[in-house]
């Protein structure tokens, strides 16, 4: 039995003791600095991180230098002490931080280890610099009244990490204990307690309550802080008042969301920019938020984050734009789309897919072989089970999770499908522990009757638990069986070779893939078209890696050589051929946890953060950064994302699920339309897909069999109080032609993962092509393995060419009709047409419902 947290409680307490001792050597314990110094330091903050003796000091420095608050990470051997006003620090340390300026971490010896500090809030002369103020463990991005509550995201109690129910119970107990301890601390405050003690105790309680969704209780805790600050004439109190106002604004805005967007949900709620139908009707949370944000901006008018939140809050109460003071207003013209591909309406509610939950993964695929695409969903909440929604074929979905045997599969931030045993039934791989603590993964075998069996241990994928966010299933040795590469956080990533008998062997060392990093995404693709699938690894805080498959079970790292090692703080990634030239290109997003970049973009201000990257394949397996050329040099904090063809022109578009853990990170998810491989255009506003809630697992799929890609987005954040309904955006249709293909491998893996498709067209006498690499798409969200390919208008399909994994020559099909579904079996001549009945999502067709082959009642 592996104990997640076993033996760590005492160690964690020891680290806390050392950290507090180290902090006390750097903090002013009295008002010994001259008042002029305190005044000059008003609004200036540093972040402090305590690193154990022999801990990863350089690792921490690199992350801080990139502008990320360390409270967002759980790095072994390091502990964030949060944001500390410069006025509270030792004079020499504060002076040194001021001298070097933001973005330059300073290392100082400390009792039991090392203290790493970095200036966050700039001095007045530096107010134009970006401040990364998002703290995952606090209500808002700025307030730092107490040591971080990041421990709420990890397990600090002994528990068997392979026992999912035990992990759930341990999490609940940990949170309950934290709330009890925080209440006790506030109740124990003596009359006239020093201001720092009052703020620390109430902020601890408020943060814990907000984590659970008790916004009213959290607001009361922060109001207690605000009342004390208003009554205290000291410079220290004046310096903290803005933070209290911001926290209260954020908490009240979230209270308004819970009362309206969650409890009284409609299809336009939280879609940015907000329409009249999205206005809050219940409670006064948003109105209170407007008042707090306005008062804050009177104190600190340069804060772009609060300025953005004020505009959003005003939209929710119907006073935008006129009700926002002109100097704080972000005008409506800033949000307009340059093009209009049509409105995608959210039909998740009537379709039966408006699950309310936290962040999680998504798979859209056919799990019962009936020709209708189903939806599988996971949740970061360790007590929430895996959900399977069966497509009834009438516009609605049925929750068959219990019947499928999935209720014991608790938690899991990400999902991906596979067919590891080549039986033709879609299996599920669940990844757990990402951003969190080591919890086991699960391989779920599809039994072919809409039930699943956990075969993780039997298959050889059990053993030690890890923090896992991403995995790539591919046939790396071309033996016809899908292998799996699993990317872990801070432990050795692993390559497992499929033996072909339902079991796997760890070949990581043999393959030359032994590395350790904070790996957030892994994807497979053949970058040099040599017939061997290569591997790209997206790391958070370190360079990204491209492993070239040399054949014979060996890989060579060539990321820098091929030009794809950036960005430094990356997340979701994928291979796709965005310009249809037959070579795989690469997109990598950044996870910059700041709200400030959003108003910067809309106001036309510089965005100093890292942009996403699009790397164009030069046709030899090396890449060129074409991000600015494509109009994508934007800083968009992204988590889940995927690609699809929203207008059936055959060029792949994409959707970014935005956000970060903080309740403050309300920003629209973004849709980008591909302009024939030459540029990408933001069509978020015109398509109506700019959801403000945090976006995670994303899938493009033709869920209604009408010949175009619909969009499913798993919505919700990391905290228990940040749950939200998922969204299903129905494609309005564009009248263009298309073809859907299901490939069945015989010598290749049966799911045909890693096959190349080329559709050769005659467009007005000119031969063109549309290409697809068979995959589920991005690393956070899985689209169907059946390939839907848009063919534009007026084209004639001349032939279909298929390069099967491991095959020497392509399989060629002719006589394929447009606007059809076909099945192609490797090595068999011709193809099999498949009939499909179209239907309207969310509107059951009269007389057209069908009984389930497994359960007529479904």
Q: Which residues does each PLM region occupy?
A:
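Blade-edge motifs of beta-propeller repeat domains
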Residues: 322-357, 390-410, 444-466, 497-517, ...
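Hydrophobic beta-strand segments that make up the repeating blades of beta-propeller
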Residues: 362, 372-379, 424, 428-433, ...
């Amino acid at each position: 039995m592996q104990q997640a947290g076993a033996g760590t409680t005492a160690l964690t307490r020891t680290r806390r003791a050392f950290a507090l001792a180290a902090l006390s050597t750097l903090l002013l314990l009295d008002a010994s600095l001259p008042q002029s110094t305190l005044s000059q330091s008003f609004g200036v903050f540093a972040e402090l991180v305590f690193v154990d003796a022999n801990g990863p000091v350089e690792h921490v420095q690199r992350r801080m230098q990139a502008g990320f608050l360390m409270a967002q990470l759980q790095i072994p051997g390091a502990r964030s002490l949060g944001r500390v006003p410069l006025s509270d620090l030792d004079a020499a340390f504060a002076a040194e931080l001021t001298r070097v300026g933001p973005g330059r971490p300073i290392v100082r010896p400390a009792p039991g280890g090392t203290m790493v500090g970095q200036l966050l809030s700039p001095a007045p002369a530096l107010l134009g610099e970006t401040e990364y103020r998002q703290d995952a463990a606090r209500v808002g991005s700025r307030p730092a009244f107490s040591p971080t509550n990041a421990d709420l995201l990890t397990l600090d109690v002994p528990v068997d990490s392979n026992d999912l129910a035990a992990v759930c119970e341990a999490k609940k107990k940990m949170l309950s204990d934290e709330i009890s301890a925080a209440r006790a601390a506030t109740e124990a405050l003596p009359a006239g307690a020093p201001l720092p003690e009052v703020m620390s105790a109430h902020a601890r309680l408020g943060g814990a309550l907000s984590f659970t969704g008790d916004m009213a209780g959290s607001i009361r805790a922060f109001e207690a802080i605000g009342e004390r600050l208003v009554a205290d004439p000291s410079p220290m109190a004046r310096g903290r008042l803005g933070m209290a106002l911001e926290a209260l604004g954020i908490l009240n805005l979230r209270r308004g969301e819970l009362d309206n967007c969650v409890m009284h949900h409609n299809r336009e709620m939280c879609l940015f920019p907000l329409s009249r139908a999205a206005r809050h009707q219940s409670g006064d949370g948003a109105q209170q938020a407007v008042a707090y944000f306005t008062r804050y901006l009177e104190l600190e008018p340069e804060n772009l984050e609060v300025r953005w939140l004020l505009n959003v809050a005003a939209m929710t109460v119907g006073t935008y734009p006129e009700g926002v003071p002109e100097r704080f207003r972000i005008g409506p013209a800033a949000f307009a789309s340059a093009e209009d591909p049509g409105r995608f309406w959210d039909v998740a509610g009537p379709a039966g897919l408006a699950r309310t939950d936290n962040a999680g993964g998504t798979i859209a695929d056919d799990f019962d072989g009936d020709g209708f695409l189903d939806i599988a969903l996971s949740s970061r909440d360790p007590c929430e089970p895996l959900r399977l929604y069966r497509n009834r074929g009438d516009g609605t979905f049925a929750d068959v999770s219990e019947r499928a045997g999935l209720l014991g599969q608790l938690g899991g931030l990400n999902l991906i499908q596979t067919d590891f045993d080549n039986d033709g039934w879609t299996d599920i791989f669940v990844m757990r522990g990402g951003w969190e603590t080591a919890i086991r993964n699960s391989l779920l075998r599809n039994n072919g009757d809409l039930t699943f069996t956990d075969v993780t241990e039997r298959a050889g994928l059990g053993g030690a638990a890890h923090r896992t966010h991403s995995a790539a299933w591919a046939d790396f040795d071309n033996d016809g069986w899908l292998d799996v590469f699993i990317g872990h956080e801070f432990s050795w990533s692993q390559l497992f070779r499929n033996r072909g008998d339902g079991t796997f062997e760890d070949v990581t060392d043999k393959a030359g893939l032994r590395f350790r990093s904070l790996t957030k995404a892994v994807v497979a693709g053949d970058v040099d078209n040599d017939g061997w699938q290569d591997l790209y690894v997206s790391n958070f805080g370190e360079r990204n890696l491209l492993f070239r498959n040399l054949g014979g079970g060996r890989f060579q790292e060539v990321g820098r050589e091929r030009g794809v090692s950036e960005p430094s703080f990356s997340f979701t990634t994928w291979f796709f051929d965005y310009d249809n030239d037959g070579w795989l290109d690469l997109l990598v997003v950044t996870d910059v946890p700041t709200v400030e970049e959003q108003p910067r973009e809309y106001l036309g201000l510089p965005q100093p953060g890292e942009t996403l990257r699009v790397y164009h394949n030069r046709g030899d397996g090396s890449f060129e950064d074409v991000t600015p050329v494509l109009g994508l040099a934007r800083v968009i904090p992204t988590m889940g994302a995927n690609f699809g063809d929203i207008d059936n022109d055959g060029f792949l578009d994409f959707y970014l699920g935005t956000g970060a853990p903080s309740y403050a990170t309300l920003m629209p998810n973004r849709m980008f339309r591909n302009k024939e491989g030459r540029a990408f255009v933001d069509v978020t506003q015109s398509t109506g897909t700019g959801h403000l809630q945090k976006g995670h697992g994303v899938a493009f799929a033709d869920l209604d069999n009408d010949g175009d890609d619909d969009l499913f987005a798993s919505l919700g954040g990391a905290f228990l109080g940040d749950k939200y309904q998922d969204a299903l955006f129905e494609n309005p249709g564009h009248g263009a032609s298309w073809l859907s293909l299901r490939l069945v491998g015989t010598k290749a893996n049966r799911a045909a993962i890693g096959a190349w498709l080329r559709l050769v067209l005659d467009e007005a006498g000119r031969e063109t092509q549309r290409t697809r690499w068979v995959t589920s798409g991005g690393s956070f969200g899985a689209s169907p393995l059946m390939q839907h390919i848009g063919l534009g208008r007026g084209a004639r399909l001349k032939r279909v060419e298929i390069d099967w994994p491991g095959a020497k020559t392509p399989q060629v099909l002719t006589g394929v009709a447009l606007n059809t579904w076909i099945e192609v079996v490797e090595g068999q001549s011709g193809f099999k047409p498949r009939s499909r009945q179209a239907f309207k999502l969310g509107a059951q067709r009269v007389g057209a419902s069908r009984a389930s082959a497994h359960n007529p009642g479904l």
